[in-house]
Amino acid sequence: MVFFTCNACGESVKKIQVEKHVSICRNCECLSCIDCGKDFWGDDYKNHVKCISEDQKYGGKGYEAKTHKGDVKQQAWIQKINELIKKPNVSPKVRELLQQISAFDNVPRKKAKFQNWMRNSLKVHSDSVLEQVWNIFSEAASSEQDQQPPSHMAKPNTEVPTKVPSTKTNGTTEEQTEAKKNKRERKEERQKSRKKEKKELKLENHQENLKGQKPKKRKKGQEAGHEAGGEDAAEANGAPEKKRARDAQASEEGADRNGGPAEDADEGPTKTAAGKRKRQKHSEVESDNKKKKMKLPGQPEEGEPEDHEAPSKGKFNWKGTIKAVLKQAPDNEISVKKLKKKVIAQYHAVMSDHHTSEEELLAIFNKKISRNPTFKVLKDKVKLLK
């Protein structure tokens, strides 16, 4: 549908409504098309049936409009109407109707739709007139169909030699169509390629994160396994020693009980006293062993430093060592660099574990400093709060 703007009042009008607008607006002498911008004086606008589309308007210099099958058929249909107007057998009333029909660019090509369109657009309600117009169209269409078969029969012989070079030129035509693509199509292709690249990057990052997390979990599991294995081994080594001590005690007690009948009566009381002393010693040894077992593993024994107990437990007291270093410093304050150096040196001296890397140790150290409320970090220094 073509739209015009009135140069007198500036109102936009459809092509069908131009005559009505001219009767209202007396100064209307020139109309300009909204799409192409051309000016039409007087009745010249009637010949302007079709205008450029939005794709042609905004497509750029090298844009070529695609031919639609419907448009081709519609143009052929309107051509047929123009040919029928020139025929002498047509009545003047029907000729006027045909002239009005030729001004439209959306004329239906089927009987029911055509007659309905005539009633609504041209306000023709007499069935006899509608039948006359349609009969003229149907006769013209049937005459054309009768003439077409011989031309179709003659085409295959002529098309055989021309088909061979068409295969060679397919590549060049495809390249030309790609070069003449729209700006919109190019933008869409770029956006699609960018989206694909973003998705690929996200997948790669996700896979790298998964790979980085798995070995850490394995390391933790291995360390826990090593600790559990060390404790089991210590218990297994301690069990035979206990059994040996019990066997030795039982043998000595048996010897004390069975040793008296072959000896003299004078030696009897001395042996019984010695046996009592031995039993007392064994009971004292057993009580000492029980006391040692009852002691907690974290409590140090008398005369032994706390640092010697740490490797057997498998843990390093980060909080205690940091506190000790800060207490030794003046005003309970020291630089982060010095504190880090001293604490990690103490860790290596106490722990025999070489699995943990320097980066992990630094991460643990920073975590202990920042999350503990007893330590206050001010710029590059750490202070112990009371």
Curated annotation (Swiss-Prot):
Protein's name according to its UniProt entry: Cell growth-regulating nucleolar protein
Free-text comment on this protein's domains from its UniProt entry: The N-terminal zinc-finger domains are required for the appropriate production of 28S rRNA and the formation of pre-60S particles.
Location within or outside the cell: Nucleus, Nucleolus; Cytoplasm; Cell projection, Cilium, Photoreceptor outer segment
Binding positions for Zn(2+) 2 per the UniProt entry: C33, C36, H48, C51
Recorded GO MF terms: DNA binding; DNA-binding transcription factor binding; identical protein binding; transcription regulator inhibitor activity; zinc ion binding
Oligomeric form and interacting partners: Interacts with PRMT5; this interaction is direct. Interacts with GNL2 and RPL23A. Interacts with nucleolin/NCL; this interaction is direct. Interacts with phosphorylated IRF3; this interaction impairs IRF3 DNA-binding activity.
Free-text tissue specificity from the UniProt record: Expressed in testis (at protein level).
Residues holding Zn(2+) 1: C6, C9, H21, C25
This protein's UniProt keywords: Cell projection, Coiled coil, Cytoplasm, Immunity, Innate immunity, Isopeptide bond, Metal-binding, Nucleus, Repeat, Ubl conjugation, Zinc, Zinc-finger
Pfam family, one: zf-LYAR
Transmembrane annotation, as ranges: none
Zn finger limits (C2HC LYAR-type): 1-26, 28-52
PANTHER family, A to Z: CELL GROWTH-REGULATING NUCLEOLAR PROTEIN, CELL GROWTH-REGULATING NUCLEOLAR PROTEIN LYAR
Coiled coil location: 172-214
InterPro entries for this protein: LYAR, Znf-ACC, Znf_C2H2_LYAR, Znf_C2H2_sf
Lineage top rank: taxon: Eukaryota
Stretch forming the signal peptide: none
Physiological role: Plays a role in the maintenance of the appropriate processing of 47S/45S pre-rRNA to 32S/30S pre-rRNAs and their subsequent processing to produce 18S and 28S rRNAs. Also acts at the level of transcription regulation. Along with PRMT5, binds embryonic globin promoter. Represses the expression of embryonic globin Hbb-y gene. In neuroblastoma cells, may also repress the expression of oxidative stress genes, including CHAC1, HMOX1, SLC7A11, ULBP1 and that encoding the small nucleolar RNA SNORD41. Preferentially binds to a DNA motif containing 5'-GGTTAT-3'.
Cross-link Glycyl lysine isopeptide (Lys-Gly) (interchain with G-Cter in SUMO2) placement: K14, K202
Biased segments, Basic and acidic residues type: 177-191, 198-211, 240-249
Region (Disordered): 141-316
Bias (Polar residues) ranges: 141-150, 164-174
One Gene Ontology term, aspect cellular component: nucleolus
GO BP term, example: innate immune response
